[in-house]
Amino acid sequence: IMSDFDSLTFIFDEPSVGLHEREKEKLIQVFQEIVAAGNTVIVVEHDERIISIADYIVEIGPGAGAEGGKLIFQGNYNDFLNCKDSIIAKYLKESNYFIENYKHHMDTAPILHSDNKLCIRGANINNLKNLSLSIPLYRIVGFAGVSGSGKSSPVAHTIVPKLKQILRNRVI
């Protein structure tokens, strides 16, 4: 079925919950196959391994509830690890979980043209105020942050409705 579709956006909200490490590797392989078929994968996730394979990372935070809702970071994994404002990056860097074991592939990814991005400007959703970000298409995009920080809000209340609006009159 995947060979019949391209230019679709697949959204997963914490798909690794309860999975064994071997199952997570299979999940990652599925994400990569979806992208290789010309689609976009957006993942809201806490798992270090899943975050590490994202071509582009968006972190919302810094805390939960009223302490969250701010854009902390957007960019590639290597830059993410060096983000001083990121609680998640600090944990990953201090745990040395991926730095030695995985060479991230964003450095070799082609530069995307502006028409290959989904842009959100000035979104106000739940505790997110005036959120603006650009999400590259045809990549794996990870949304990270502590529980309750607002990771799912831009996906569920902005990206999904906008994609529905854009695709309403298109036959797929």
What does each of the following model-derived ranges do?
Residues I1-I172:
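Conserved phosphate-binding elements of NTP-dependent enzyme cores
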